Amino acid sequence: MSLKQRAMLRIVLIRMLKSSILIFGSILVFNSCSSDEVLSLDEQHESKILGAYDEECRWVYAQMNHDYLWRKDMPDSLACDYTTDPVTFFKSLLSSKDKFSYSTHNSSYVGTSDFVKYGFEYQEYTDGNTNFAQVLYVTSPKLKERGLKRGDLVQLHDNKIILGVLCSNGFESRDTIEGSSPFEQTTTVYLDSIYQIERKKVGYMCYLQFNNKKDLTNVLKHFYEEQIDELVLDLRYNPGGLVSTCKYLSNSVISENGYGEIFQQCTYNDILSREYFEATGSEKTFNHFRIPNNGKGLPGSELYGLNLKRIFVLTSKYSASASEALIISLKPFMSVVVIGEQTYGKGVGSWAIRNNKYKYQLQPITMQYYNAKMETVTTDGIPVDYYVPDGYSTTKRNLGDVEEPLLKIALDLIKMEKLVMGGNACSRSVAFEEQNEGFKAIGKPSFWRDY
């Protein structure tokens, strides 16, 4: 087999791998394993006797040296300690530029499971003495029936949800709700609606995760059949997911002048770039928008074209990865109005690297993505056109409520038929509750996943 044939075979295999599992930072079958978990002391002792760490760490180095985007920042192979555990070893190879690569258990060791969520998602806060959580949205029908709603302040104790209010002396309980099952599944489309605003039909969809595109198909079909004029896409609680699903949604939304054009182009390290060039004549890879079939194709290939001229996207500082890729990929072809908070800032992607012999699989950053104009997402995130905070002090009306602050801005702009970019929506349209000052968020919200 010639060098060119071998290169072509490798590119085909890489593309097969990427088409099935490439996501913006994770694989959805892993939902509870810590990326920092290491072997027990007994397992470490046994592994060192068998030389498992040395062998696996050398495998880790070889894979990273081939696929890692910042491979030139890795330490020299002769300077590495191959006797350390694989997770620690993997971390020792990462570039200072890298905030996203991680390792996790290989599915050959832990098996697979459906991606699940709890009955509600929340953000924790503290003033240094009092800790509480604010409900962001509720997915459990049982908890909704029991009265739990967005904006509630809660504390969790022994599978009980304590509802309360903040007083001068801290959190004061007012009611108790028995907890729901911690493993209730939910569709990734949290809510979809159509509003009649003046003479326009305005679609709204709150989308939680770029997972199975089947969750989107019926909603997009409904929007297509109703011939919506505008779309408000709520991605403020969406940390990312599959690139294929991101393309599917973007392709449905985009105006017809984007059909056949570049959805995404990706750059790689020097080794992968050379292999792609030898196989295809280009160091980059390209992914294109296709022409929608509007339900007339084979089952499973349905793509409904909404052919919109603009889209309103609601964001938070935790709108990341695939959420950002959707925004940046649409910008060359239509008006994208971003409302909320500046996004997370992840313009890179990865694929999983595994070997069934070893306990851990790798999820290193392997590429940088760009839109058709070679624009990408910087580490600062995507700036907003209308700033509205989504933190503790902002009124938490139900998602989809036309008076909910971020949605209200979008609907008001549609009514006005005039956009003033770079505005500060807080000064005129956003309601704030009177709350105690001095509370700070604890960590990331519960819906966050490392994609």
Regions found by a protein language model. Give the residues of each.
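Small side chains
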Residues: G25-S26, G203
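Residue-level signal for secondary-structure boundary elements
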Residues: G25, Y68, K72, K418-G422
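C-terminal "post-core" interaction segments
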Residues: T217-N218, F223, I228-E230, P239-Y451
